[in-house]
Amino acid sequence: APRVEGERPQVLTNLQLLRKYPRFVLLLAACALLMACHSSSCTYMIHIVEKAGAGSGAMGAALALAAFLELPAMGLFSRMQQRLSLAWLLRLCAGAFLAKIVVFWLAESMTAIYLASVLQFFEYGIFTPATVYYVVEHIDRGNQVKGQALISVASSGVGSAFGSLCCGLILDRAGVSGMLLFEVACAAAGCVVMLLATGEFTFFCVDMKMMEQRAKNSL
């Protein structure tokens, strides 16, 4: 039944919210995988730059460059959205996550590390506002705060903890190259899940719409 004007929107539990928006569940999974890669690469950055033959000074410069480039990306996000859909921006940032960690994996000099750090503009700089806009556009008004909280838990909580723990264990056993290969796998999986979440594959998009409609009818 249509909602009466002035009526308070229905506030769902976490489980109800995830059932109602199955594509949002995929977005959460993509966020967790991508942030597992991003957070662990920041945590163990000193090992990455040492692999490239540098030290803590170069690490600080690379991290500063990456952090500096996040701000203009966030500031220009609204202009980007005028040219590209939100779905394409999410795919772009997922691709940047993968490209950056692949360059880290292959890097043999600090030049490559610095070039990879430039990708932070398209990576985390777009990721943060894009996920906020996704919730605003796809989650009903009464549950947007809960949606934002779930994204924070999936990315900064589950993803970061999973990535740091696994990469720490792999670093001890397989070295920096093994750790970076694991991060590449996480980023690649995150890209695939992001494509599914944003409806890139038509057959999957149709199935998601059917699931969402069934969930709405059951609430």
Regions found by a protein language model. Give the residues of each.
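Pair of pore-lining "gating" transmembrane helices in MFS-fold secondary transporters
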Residues: 19-41, 118-122
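Structural signature of the two symmetry-related core transmembrane helices
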Residues: 88-103, 184
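A membrane-interface helix-boundary motif in multi-pass transporters
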Residues: 168-189
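Helix-loop junctions at membrane interfaces in 12-TM secondary transporters
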Residues: 105-116
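Helix-to-loop junctions at the C-terminal end of transmembrane segments
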Residues: 72-86, 171-172
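Intracellular juxtamembrane helix-capping segments at the cytosolic ends
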Residues: 126-140
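Juxtamembrane intracellular "pre-TM" segments in multi-pass secondary transporters
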Residues: 1-28, 218
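Short amphipathic helix-loop junctions that connect adjacent transmembrane helices
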Residues: 40-59
